């Protein structure tokens, strides 16, 4: 990878994606513990995921437009500082409302963070290593699934979920120091206004990406938001086995990152097909697989492969197909992604409350099937004819 000093900014950003991704999904692994502690239902605890996602969805574009001209290092440090403070508040939450408020603070930092981190990593990476920088950012997210989420869940089960949030606060403070030391100043290049925004949003390729993202992520999170109680109640897994399955999602993510850096440039549509069709198939198979532990684990591994392919491929597509204002386009993508998370968690909660946890996969799979059909019939042809020069 050449001189390690040239990679320190990207490495620091990779650590930041690890900590942000750990925080984003930590309530999924602690859903039962939080529900028991506050004497609420799991579906109500799931609102921590839903409202978080909706805040990100609603705030991403307005906040990114508001800070579009802010120098990137200054903006990144401010975001991580807010993130750290909000987790301290989470760790000392003595009520469900206080925890929700703290999570809204995290969501506001998240809203801008994911809009700038990928374009920033590409910008500060050594010349000619864009795919490697992108794969490193996704690797940070994947390691969060391997280490951060399962470890946070294990800590939460042993000494309480509040300690998990405080540990995240400590780690984010360390990340803040790394970014302050190694991230160079990067002037903003977002020359976009409210007048030019519609032209960006209505770009055919981006419009297809946004619609496909909303459908796919809604289907995915209808099931994934409740994967912990699903594996425990429907599949009969123990706490230790659930933690291992959650870790497997991240292990697969690292494999995808390596494959992406080597093969994506030549096989873009193969990655997209695996992503969209794989999510559809796996969510539909969840209910059927729950009766056999081996098949259940295999389904989850393929599911992890598919969602990681989706995440890394779609971020690359945003960069490739944005005619201008890449960070703004990424903020729209992030917002829509979180609409999908929120909608999925909400739909999954309704399914859990009125039909039963074993059925979240079938409902999520039905939504994912619509996305798969849209991809096969429309998205592929539009992307092939819209490649940005």
Protein language model features and the residues they cover:
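Helix-loop-helix hairpin linking two adjacent transmembrane segments in secondary transporters
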Residues: 98, 127-183, 226, 230
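A late C-terminal transmembrane helix in Major Facilitator Superfamily
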Residues: 320-357, 363-364
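Helix-breaking motifs and short loop linkers at transmembrane-helix boundaries and internal kinks
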Residues: 39, 71, 92-98, 109, ...
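C-terminal transmembrane helical hairpin of 12-TM major facilitator-type secondary transporters
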Residues: 270-314
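Cytoplasmic helix-loop-helix junction between adjacent transmembrane helices
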Residues: 102-140
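Conserved MFS/SLC helix-loop-helix module at the cytosolic interface between two early adjacent transmembrane helices
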Residues: 58-94
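Helix-to-loop junctions at the C-terminal end of transmembrane segments
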Residues: 59-71, 256-268, 352
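Paired small-residue
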Residues: 86-89, 97-105, 294-302
């Amino acid at each position: 990878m050449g001189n390690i000093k040239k990679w320190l900014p990207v490495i620091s950003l990779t650590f930041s994606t690890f900590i942000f991704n750990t925080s984003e999904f930590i309530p999924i692994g602690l859903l039962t513990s939080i529900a028991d502690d506050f004497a609420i239902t799991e579906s109500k605890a799931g609102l921590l995921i839903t409202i978080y996602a909706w805040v990100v969805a609603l705030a991403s574009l307005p906040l990114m437009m508001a800070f579009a001209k802010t120098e990137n290092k200054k903006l990144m440090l401010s975001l991580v500082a807010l993130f750290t403070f909000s987790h301290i508040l989470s760790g000392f939450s003595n009520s469900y409302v206080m925890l929700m408020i703290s999570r809204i603070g995290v969501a506001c930092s998240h809203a801008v963070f994911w809009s700038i981190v990928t374009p920033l990593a590409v910008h500060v990476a050594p010349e000619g290593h864009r795919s490697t920088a992108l794969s490193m950012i996704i690797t940070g997210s994947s390691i969060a699934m391997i280490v951060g989420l399962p470890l946070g869940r294990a800590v939460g089960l042993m000494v309480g979920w509040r300690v998990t949030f405080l540990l995240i606060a400590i780690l984010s403070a360390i990340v803040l120091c790394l970014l302050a030391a190694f991230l160079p100043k990067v002037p903003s290049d977002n020359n976009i206004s409210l007048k030019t925004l519609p032209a960006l949003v209505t770009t055919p390729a981006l419009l297809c990406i946004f619609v496909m993202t909303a459908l796919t992520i809604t289907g995915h999170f209808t099931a994934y938001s409740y994967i912990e109680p699903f594996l425990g109640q429907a599949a009969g897994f123990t706490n230790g086995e659930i933690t291992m399955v959650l870790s497997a999602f991240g292990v697969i993510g690292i494999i995808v990152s390596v494959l992406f850096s080597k093969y994506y440039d030549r096989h873009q549509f193969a990655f997209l097909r695996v992503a969209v069709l794989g999510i559809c198939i796996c969510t539909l198979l969840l209910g059927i697989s729950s009766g056999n532990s081996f098949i259940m684990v295999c389904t989850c591994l393929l599911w992890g492969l598919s969602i990681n392919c989706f995440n890394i491929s779609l971020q690359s597509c945003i960069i490739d197909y944005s005619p201008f204002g890449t960070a703004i386009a990424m903020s729209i993508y992030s917002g829509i992604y979180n609409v999908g998370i929120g909608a999925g968690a909400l739909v999954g909660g309704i399914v859990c409350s009125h039909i039963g946890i074993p059925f979240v996969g079938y409902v999520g799979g039905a939504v994912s099937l619509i996305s798969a059909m849209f991809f096969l019939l429309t998205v592929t042809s539009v992307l092939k004819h819209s490649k940005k020069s």
